[in-house]
Amino acid sequence: MNKQIVVLGVLALLLVVTAAATASSTAREATPGVTKKQVVIGATFPFSGVASSYGVIAKAEAAYYKWVNAHGGVNGRKIKFVTLDDGYNPAKTVPLTKELVEQDHVFAIVGQLGTEPVLSVRQYLNSHKVPQVLVSTGASYWGTQYKKYPWTIGWQPNYVAEGAIYGQYIDAHQKSAKIGVLFQNDDYGKDYVRGFRAGLGKGKNKIVKSEGYSITEQSIAAHIALLKASGANTFFIAATPTFAIQAIVVASKLNWHPKIYLNSVSGTNDLMNIAAQSAGSQDAVKGIISTAYTLIPDDPHYAKTPGMKLYRKVMAAEKPGTRLNDAFNVYGMGQGWAFVNALKRAGKNPTRKSLMKALLHTNTRANPFLLPGMVTKTSASDHFPLNQARLDKFQGGHFVPFGKLLTYPNQ
């Protein structure tokens, strides 16, 4: 009888241990960041430093997720968006991203900002099969190197293609152009220049001077002075907002008034008006040409569109603490919409793999925050979600569209 009790006790203990081991195994196999009620995602953004104006993107994206949560969430789950400040410094991006993955156990890194910051953790995230998606940078890498880095995908039109648009336009419309180029001397700026030169084609000999700057420089006035001295009558700027504004202001102060082409990430109404105010004249920004692919908050052409109506509702309800007419708000919400759309299609019990599958099987015109008619399209062999844009010219305090929506080959 005593032996039976001992045997039964041992069997019971084995059952408990087995059950515990099974439960532990199941817990380990569960998708990180996903519970029955919540999906946790995260990203690093520059809330401080030279690129802090981009922090608006994260705040608006978070506001959109709050709006979605207030209206039922996604497949019964609320989205929690954890953002950390890396100051646009890759040395900070690495430990902060590891914190998001290893301590916060995020489901995915969504919207992470900056070419160099994103590159600094791409290998780490891909080796751990953590989705690094809809990154806030148009570097061509995200679309061209997908075989080596299958867990990374961008969102916005890529910089090479955008640069080509400006080059093609100048080659076609400014036969006597003498071009000075200012670019951020890293992968971000070099992508723009590569596309710009390709767009110029045989006209690339119109470039008379190129100047690269470092984000650690306090002033780029010396670069602008050299560009002016070159005799350039056309100025292509591939810079982040702080340096783009500085370039415009310094050119004005030096009494240099070339035809200016400005990359889209710095070409917003808010930033142009800040530049004009700093220069002391609207003439400093008059006629600047840039491109757009999202709705512009204070553009009367889109005031009555469903996207702009939704935008104002989200801003009023969630109060992200950003300026209503800051175009980076729309960027953030458009990005948020893209993630929510993919999460819905990733299934009732989403996995990291099913999220990537959804992102790579997209074909929609439904994103309300993009320009009317724009298509978001991907496939197993096409990892560039957006490849359309429209040329805009700054006049009367805001960018005015001209020409049609352009579709360009991804590069």
Model-flagged regions — what are they?
Residues 1-40, 410-411:
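Short, low-complexity disordered leader/linker segments with a strong preference
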Residues 251-332, 405-409:
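Extracellular/periplasmic periplasmic-binding protein-like sensory domains
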Residues 105-211, 261-290:
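Extracytoplasmic ligand/sensor domains, especially the bilobed periplasmic-binding protein
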Residues 317-329, 340-398:
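Segments of small-molecule ligand-sensing domains
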Residues 93, 154-178, 218-221, 244, ...:
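Hydrophobic alpha-helical segments within soluble ligand-binding/sensing domains
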Residues 24-42, 73-78, 171-177, 349:
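Immediate post-signal peptide segment of exported/extracytoplasmic ligand-binding proteins
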Residues 27-29, 38, 52-59, 71-145, ...:
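Beta-alpha junction/loop-to-helix N-cap segments that form part of ligand/metal-binding clefts
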Residues 28-37, 42-62, 84-91, 113-114, ...:
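Extracytoplasmic "Venus flytrap"
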